[in-house]
Amino acid sequence: MQNIKITIAYDGAAFHGWQFQPGELQTIQGTLQEALRKITQERIMIHGASRTDAGVHALGQVAHFKTRSNLTAQELQRAMNALMPPSVRVVEACDVGQDFHSRWLAQAKTYRYRIYRGRILPPFVYGRVLHYPWELNEDAMSAAARQFEGEHDFSSFAASTGSEEDDKDRDMMRVIYRSEIVRDPANCEIAYVVRGKSFLRYMVRKIVGTLLEVGKGKFDVSDIPRIFDARDRSLSGPTVQPQGLYLVGLEYPDPTNSWATFKAQRRAKG
């Protein structure tokens, strides 16, 4: 039995997110699994590191799957790319140890949200950026972005589960290692770049919506700690559209730090 790690890039515009859905809805996971079924004649479950939402793109999504196929990782990669639409590509594949788990062993994820600032949106970036040509105080947005670094309760920046009890029980604490606004004047763009251990659903898009409110002057930089403390999602900015969001990549520990080691550490913590 092989355990194969793959790195995937995709344009999320035509897909209903990462996670497989029954019926005819096209998803990234479903597309990958269908290609593998045709290649191996096996019913293979692909485990993704991040469950990106509908319309969200990826430059370096990571997943893994187990197969009895005798094909090498590179042969599987070529065969999958030949069967899938050009909007999804396996850009790297390798055979890893049986203990590797793409989701649970990830140490950090990096996301990038692109905002196009030009007056006219070029057709070739349509569906890949948020278009906002109006005035923004980008310096204030940069200062506000830095407020998200460190460990915080992100209750004000997450989607509701739909259940008040479940919302109360969720662990909303997250650690953010990097949070900044990056300017790209040559392409009339700014981007929000964030790197952290893990993220809540809609968290990045809620942060971007809040930073835009700062840029418009509706929020002040000093409002960010107040919004954190309130633990009330109605006080943060709107959830921006998905098309500007990219999963840039994931980071993993040394291969010797295995899935079995991770589970042992979890048990030790109780």
Where are these regions (language model features)?
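Structured-RNA-binding interfaces characteristic of tRNA pseudouridine synthases
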Residues: 1-270
